[in-house]
Amino acid sequence: MAGGGRIPLWIVATVAGTGVLVVVGLFFYGAYAGLGSSL
């Protein structure tokens, strides 16, 4: 499996993890902001 992919796996994992954290963070922030504004 060495030399097959051009993008290192750790870079893919880091980008994917960061994207998931950003999406989850935006979701919770939007829910929190929505609840705060509705109150």
Swiss-Prot record:
Short name of any one Pfam family annotated for the protein: PsbJ
As for subcellular location, the record says: Cellular thylakoid membrane
Tell me yes or no: is Transmembrane helix among this UniProt entry's keywords: yes
Q: How does it sit in the membrane?
A: Single-pass membrane protein
Q: Which Gene3D superfamilies match?
A: 6.10.250.2070
The record's function comment reads:
One of the components of the core complex of photosystem II (PSII). PSII is a light-driven water:plastoquinone oxidoreductase that uses light energy to abstract electrons from H(2)O, generating O(2) and a proton gradient subsequently used for ATP formation. It consists of a core antenna complex that captures photons, and an electron transfer chain that converts photonic excitation into a charge separation.
- What is the name listed in the Swiss-Prot or TrEMBL entry for this protein? Photosystem II reaction center protein J
Source species, please? Synechococcus elongatus (strain ATCC 33912 / PCC 7942 / FACHB-805)
Q: Which gene encodes it?
A: psbJ
